[in-house]
A protein has these predicted regions:
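Bacterial signal peptide processing site
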Residues: 51-54
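Immediate post-signal peptide segment of exported/extracytoplasmic ligand-binding proteins
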Residues: 56-81, 202-213, 350-354
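Short, well-ordered beta-strand elements
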Residues: 76-89, 107-112, 210-215
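Ligand-binding "clamshell"
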Residues: 143-172, 259, 271-284
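A bilobed periplasmic-binding-protein/Venus flytrap-type ligand-binding module shared by bacterial periplasmic
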Residues: 181-191, 291-304
Length: 354
């Protein structure tokens, strides 16, 4: 069974409307005035001691496992708070981070599942939380205000890390978990259409325009890093009548059924494997990189430098296959995010009971 949500107020402390957030589709990637205003509001609330979500102590009896990669318990005596956004993948990553800190000896407060798309970042910036997993593309495009993504994943991380230092944040090396956009289709349609890459789709759109039908979310249909930009980058010809707009969950089910030949997906979504959808290669590397990386409060890292050491092996082990499995266990099988994270860390040897 899933854990019941921890109690939180109806809005940002005062009872007003809470900032909206959602699944991976709402990772807050768009820069703009609204983002800046929301960030300022959240920073003020956090600085004033107004919590967006009540925290609770992690109470697992765990120690470093055989693959932890460090001696002893280097965080013994540390008091650390972990946070995350409120969609499944983020919550699981937050639980992973907290469990790793626990195993290394820290006393950990769990403030994962913060409402709003920028609340977790503001918590880390303000020192209300010490660390979170964040996405490099979100940092570059949304938080730092750039419009052109960096194609190379490592370079994307390096430029974000360098620029975000001014905000008192340190980005540790990223994982291979890249939660970005993709197009997918069911096996029958892949066999019928013979497409394996987005370039194949572009070629098909010229040869047989009626064959390229798309199920997408409303946002993807209008974003520059979504359908319009993808069509330009690949030279796709997709008539507006071939595009069906719907909510995220419906996109997956309709793509599985073959209502549309192709559907917009997120590369780490657990429903991809559960529904046996085939993801097409972005062979021109159009979609931005959204690699998950630890984002640490600089003062916290200076006080407890071992945070970097204990997170490194776990971060290196995270990839899209792992994320799809963990997300599926929560979203499809209904398992508890904390237990899913713990089971994975135990299985991989990063922590042990006791």
């Amino acid at each position: 069974m899933r854990r019941a949500p921890r109690s939180r107020g109806p809005g940002l402390c005062s009872g007003g409307p809470a900032l909206r957030s959602g699944g991976p589709a709402l990772r807050a990637r768009r820069p703009g005035r609204c983002r800046a205003v929301a960030a300022a509001l959240l920073a003020g609330l956090l600085a004033g001691g107004c919590g967006l979500i009540s925290g609770s102590a992690m109470t697992d009896t765990v120690r470093p496992g055989p693959k932890a990669g460090y001696p002893g318990r280097p965080l013994t005596g540390a008091q650390l708070t972990v946070t995350s956004k409120e969609f499944t993948e983020q919550i699981v990553l937050g639980q992973i981070m907290g469990l790793v800190f626990e195993a290394a000896g820290a006393h950990v407060i769990d403030k994962t599942s913060i409402q709003g798309s920028i609340g977790a970042r503001e918590a880390v910036k303000s020192g209300t939380a010490d660390a979170a997993y964040e996405y490099t593309g979100t940092g570059w495009i949304t938080y730092l205000g750039h419009t052109k993504p960096v194609i190379d994943p490592q370079e994307q991380w390096r430029v974000v890390r360098a620029e975000d230092r001014k905000n008192g944040l340190v980005w540790l090396p990223p994982s291979k978990l890249n939660n970005t956009y993709a197009l997918a289709l069911n096996p029958a349609n892949q066999k019928k259409l013979g497409v394996h890459t987005l370039s194949d789709v572009a070629a098909l759109s010229h040869k047989d325009p009626g064959a390229v039908t798309l199920c997408v979310e409303n946002e993807f249909a209008t974003r520059n890093d979504g359908l319009p930009g993808m069509a330009r980058a690949y030279g796709m010809q997709v008539p507006s009548g071939n595009v069906r707009k719907m909510t995220g969950g419906v996109v997956y089910t309709e793509t599985k059924k073959g209502t549309c030949a192709l559907g917009e997906v997120f590369t780490t979504d657990g429903r991809i494997k559960a529904m046996n959808l085939q993801v097409l290669a972005d062979d021109k590397h159009f979609f931005p990189n959204y690699n998950a990386a630890p984002e640490i409060n600089a003062a916290s890292l200076k006080k407890y430098p071992a945070m970097a050491e204990v997170l490194a092996p776990v971060t290196r082990a995270l990839n899209n296959t792992v994320a799809q499995e963990l997300n599926r266990k929560v979203d499809v099988d209904g398992e508890d995010p904390h237990q899913v994270a713990k089971d994975w860390l135990l299985r991989e040897g990063f922590i042990r009971e006791g």
